[in-house]
Curated annotation (Swiss-Prot):
This is Histidine--tRNA ligase. GO terms for cellular component: cytoplasm. NCBIfam families: hisS. It comes from Azoarcus sp. (strain BH72). GO terms for molecular function: ATP binding; histidine-tRNA ligase activity.
Length: 433
């Protein structure tokens, strides 16, 4: 007996009941994005490895530890399963001249991302993100729009206990001044740094401020703050974002240790967090990345965006009672005999042609067993075709969930009869015809 194969650890199957919930959630998200004028874009799952090294940063956990990378056996090209979407989206915009040729772009995407992490609750090796990118917008208004968009989605989903944290990372020269001061400070406390801190001291010291190590909290709490190195322009930008948020009635907390894990961010950064998902409490994060387009070889363009983890957001939504009811078919078609089976195919297609959902029974069985499956499907109506109906070119229409007996109608009158049963409660006798 051969060994049973299973999915890769940390990469999960999404089975039909759960997948229907995902689709319902995705419909809500698509409507929300379109209401703000964002348009879909789809990028490959596999990209050149240098794209992520250049965009995310060589000295980041993602690039150093978490990417699924391999060498193409055909041409030796180094490729990577995408660990995030922003770099791919910006690459596509540059390659196809979207911003330079067509002006500022509001774009969104959703799909799987891949990181080689230790699987745990809320953290997977294949996970799904919804990403939003605004390319070619320089002002604080787009930063605020992104945050306000999220607040509206939480309201649409009925989510509670999701709070906003914001910070400003300033401009490159301001971060450089702060970086020098931070390194000088941390050198005085080098003996207290853990292994990650020692490794990042000279390569990415800002990330030390984001440590979860409780022993390092006194050190990072007393560290120089980036806010003290911001120039007038960066301060004005951040102040304007806060003013928009206050006007929108969105509460927030300034978190001076919020730095994000990707090197391309500047100025505004934000996270929406919750305490209801355990340690993995971030459900959405983003900010401004004005230098990334030029960094990836395009004409310099300002940009901002955010991404949300679908698995975490779904868990929060379901915890808040957001899971939809299962969508049952309108009709289940049962049949007995060769002639009845042929007519059943015609009946099912006729109903689908009028906008009804219909499941055609396959696999044989008695009328009793087929009717049991019809009832179990949740369908509102069974269309019944036996030898007598088939000989007469007629079908039986039997309500399964409401009052009324079975009626026989011609194939031409089937859709009208089904509509009459389905919509009788609303007084719509011609529904679907």
């Amino acid at each position: 007996m051969s060994q049973t194969l299973q999915a890769v650890r940390g990469m999960n199957d999404i089975l039909p009941d759960e997948a229907e919930t995902w689709e319902h959630f995705e419909d809500i998200v698509r409507d929300w994005l379109k209401s703000y004028g964002y348009r879909p874009i789809r990028m490959p799952l596999v990209e050149p490895t240098p794209l992520f090294k250049r965009a995310i940063g060589e000295v980041t956990d993602i690039v150093e530890k978490e990417m699924y990378s391999f060498e193409d056996a055909l041409n030796g090209e180094h490729l990577t399963l995408r660990p995030e979407g922003t770099a791919s989206c910006v690459r596509a915009a540059i390659q196809h001249n979207l911003v330079a040729g067509h002006g500022p772009q509001r774009l969104y995407y959703h799909g799987p991302m891949f990181r080689h992490e230790r699987p745990q609750k809320g953290r997977y090796r294949q996970f799904h993100q919804i990403g939003v990118e605004a390319l070619g917008f320089a002002g604080p208004d787009i930063d605020a729009e992104h945050i306000i968009m999220c607040a509206r989605l939480w309201d649409d989903l009925g989510l509670e206990d999701v709070s906003l944290e914001i910070n400003s990372l300033g401009a490159a020269e301001e971060r450089a001044q702060h970086r020098a001061a931070l390194i000088a400070y941390l050198e005085q406390h080098r003996d207290k740094l853990d292994e990650d801190g020692q490794r990042r001291l000279y390569t990415n010291p800002l990330r030390i401020l984001d440590t979860k190590n409780p022993d390092l909290q006194p050190v990072v709490e007393a560290a120089p703050r980036l806010a003290d190195y911001l120039g007038d322009e960066s301060r004005a930008h951040f102040d304007a974002v806060q003013l928009f948020l206050k006007d929108a009635g969105i509460p927030y907390r300034i978190n001076h240790r919020l730095v994000r894990g990707l090197d391309y961010y500047n100025r505004t950064v934000f996270e929406w967090v919750t305490t209801r998902l355990g340690a993995q409490g971030t459900v959405c994060a983003g900010g401004r990345y004005d230098g990334l387009v030029a960094q990836l070889g395009g004409k310099p363009q300002p940009a901002a965006g955010f991404a949300m983890g679908v698995e975490r957001l779904l868990a929060l939504w379901q915890e808040s009672g957001g899971e939809p009811e299962r969508q049952a078919p309108d009709v289940y078609v049962v049949h007995l005999g060769e002639a009845a089976q042929r007519l059943a195919f015609q009946a099912a297609e006729a109903l689908r042609g009028h906008g009804f959902s219909a499941v055609l029974h396959c696999g044989g069985g008695s009328f009793k067993s087929q009717m049991k499956k019809a009832d179990g499907s949740g369908a509102s109506i069974a269309v019944v075709i036996g030898e007598d109906e088939a000989a007469a070119g007629e079908v039986g229409v039997k309500p399964l969930r409401g009052p009324g007996g079975q009626q026989r109608v011609t194939l031409a009158a089937l859709a009208e009869a089904v509509g009459g049963v389905l919509y009788s409660d609303q007084g719509d006798d011609d529904g679907g015809v």
